[in-house]
Curated annotation (Swiss-Prot):
PROSITE patterns: CEREAL_TRYP_AMYL_INH. Its main location: secreted. This is Seed allergenic protein RAG1. Gene3D superfamilies: Plant lipid-transfer and hydrophobic proteins (1.10.110.10). GO terms for molecular function: IgE binding; nutrient reservoir activity; serine-type endopeptidase inhibitor activity. InterPro entries: Allergen/amylase_inhib_rice (IPR002411), Allergen/soft/tryp_amyl_inhib (IPR006106), Allergen/tryp_amyl_inhib_CS (IPR006105), Bifun_inhib/LTP/seed_sf (IPR036312), Bifunc_inhib/LTP/seed_store (IPR016140). Belongs to the cereal trypsin/alpha-amylase inhibitor family. Seed storage protein.
């Protein structure tokens, strides 16, 4: 009888140890693989975020002619700015914040129909697709989107929350 209690106690300790280790691993996983409270403008990326990417996205949206050396420099600068956002989880947030800034600059609302023009020759959906695809083009990691495309691209009619 006493040996059964010892075996049961040992098994209970083993199970509790395994559960404690699993909980610690899950907590570490959540901390590493999810956006934190620090993913905000002025904290994880500048308040006026990604100025070269703003230029690039607007040029892409209107389908400006042949690429020039200046355009290549804008691409490189944009990719450097996007890579400089230290936390991969925050990159889509920085792009979303950038789009919000573009809309404010143009006097457009943040939410709207994807086919609506935000400026001559540029529809909202095209502008958002150009921004959402930058991580893939720049080959920077974003852990929250398939194929390097920001998750909010899949929901063009859903207003973005902004940051």
């Amino acid at each position: 009888m006493a040996s059964n209690k010892v075996v049961f106690s040992v098994l209970l300790l083993v199970v509790l140890s395994v559960l404690a280790a699993a909980m610690a691993t899950m907590a570490d996983h959540h901390q590493v693989y999810s956006p934190g409270e620090q993913c905000r403008p002025g904290i994880s990326y500048p308040t006026y975020s990604l100025p070269q990417c703003r230029t690039l996205v607007r040029r892409q949206c209107v389908g400006r002619g042949a690429a020039s050396a200046a355009d290549e420099q804008v691409w490189q600068d944009c990719c450097r700015q996007l890579a400089a956002v230290d936390d991969g989880w925050c990159r889509c947030g920085a792009l979303d914040h950038m789009l919000s800034g573009i809309y404010r600059e143009l006097g457009a609302t943040e939410a709207g129909h994807p086919m609506a023009e935000v400026f001559p020759g540029c529809r909202r959906g095209d502008l958002e697709r150009a921004a959402a695809s930058l991580p893939a083009f720049c080959n920077v990691d974003i852990p929250n989107g398939p194929g390097g495309v920001c998750y909010w691209l899949g929901y063009p009619r859903t207003p973005r929350t902004g940051h």
